[in-house]
């Protein structure tokens, strides 16, 4: 199980700058979600994705603060990992996962991880390097998006996973140079035993500086919940938010 945070902005900024004083509250979640952290920046200009991943807790990392402060971009994703049992703690299993101008982060589990492998296009299957369910989720999404387009492709990927796999949560964020897609798709009853009822909730906050989406568990005054079984699509040119039933 993991924590997700992402933003898009009309201006180049950083996570500490756009989130503000409460960013430290989000980072503190790495006391539990301590198996790694990862950052990707996805500029709308189409410049290459910058990817940083470490197998350590963000709050205890000697490089985390400097990395999130210096990576300035108009779009970025941040992931705090709490590894699913049976999935190794390694840099290759640390999110985000990237392909072309797409970057992806996931919170939840798909059992067994390989159950969706037959539905992944061979060109993407050849890119899989570890045993992570999340990596397979990403490449299934890429397979379907290439065939059907962004929203229809994502819906198709979710349908395949739900038909063939056993899942706790498929919450995720996918970003490219044109769009920022956040998915809230989870089984509340399958949260960790210790976690509050809102553990899987995703919330968002439009501001003059951009749009933020994040997992729960930290101070989020004024944020709006993204309803379960829905996705939010942000157009990175207009910053309009479209909420879609999935």
What residue ranges belong to the model's regions?
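Fold-independent oxyanion-binding glycine-rich loops
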Residues: 10, 79-82, 107, 185, ...
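Extreme N-terminus nucleophile/cap motif
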Residues: 1-56, 76, 182, 187-188, ...
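Conserved beta-strand-loop-short alpha-helix elements that form
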Residues: 2, 102-112
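Catalytic core of PPM/PP2C metal-dependent serine/threonine phosphatase domains
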Residues: 75, 150-186
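Long, charge-dense
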Residues: 117-142
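A conserved acidic, glycine/proline-rich C-terminal tail/linker
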Residues: 192-230
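Short acidic (Asp/Glu) patches
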Residues: 55-66, 79-100, 120-123, 217
């Amino acid at each position: 199980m993991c924590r997700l945070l992402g933003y898009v902005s009309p201006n180049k900024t950083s996570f500490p700058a756009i989130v503000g004083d409460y960013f430290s509250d989000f980072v503190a979640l790495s006391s539990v979600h301590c198996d790694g952290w990862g950052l990707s920046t996805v500029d709308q200009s189409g410049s290459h994705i910058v990817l940083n991943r470490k197998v350590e807790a963000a709050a205890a990392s000697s490089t985390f603060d400097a990395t999130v402060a210096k990576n300035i971009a108009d779009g970025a994703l941040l992931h705090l990992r709490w590894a699913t049992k049976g999935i190794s703690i390694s840099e290759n299993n640390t999110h985000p996962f990237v392909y072309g101008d797409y970057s992806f982060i996931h919170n939840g589990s798909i059992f067994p991880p390989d159950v969706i492998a037959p539905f992944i296009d061979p060109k993407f299957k050849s890119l899989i390097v570890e045993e992570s369910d999340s990596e397979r989720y990403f490449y299934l999404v890429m397979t379907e998006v290439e065939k059907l387009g962004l929203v229809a492709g994502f819906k198709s990927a979710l349908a395949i996973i739900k038909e063939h796999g056993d899942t706790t949560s498929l919450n995720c964020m996918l970003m490219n140079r044109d769009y920022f897609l956040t998915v809230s798709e989870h089984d509340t009853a399958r949260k960790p035993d210790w976690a509050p009822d809102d553990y899987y909730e995703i919330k968002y906050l439009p501001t003059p500086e951009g749009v933020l989406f994040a997992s729960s568990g930290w101070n989020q005054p004024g944020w709006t919940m993204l309803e379960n079984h829905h996705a939010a699509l942000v157009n990175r040119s207009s910053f309009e938010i479209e909420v879609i039933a999935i």
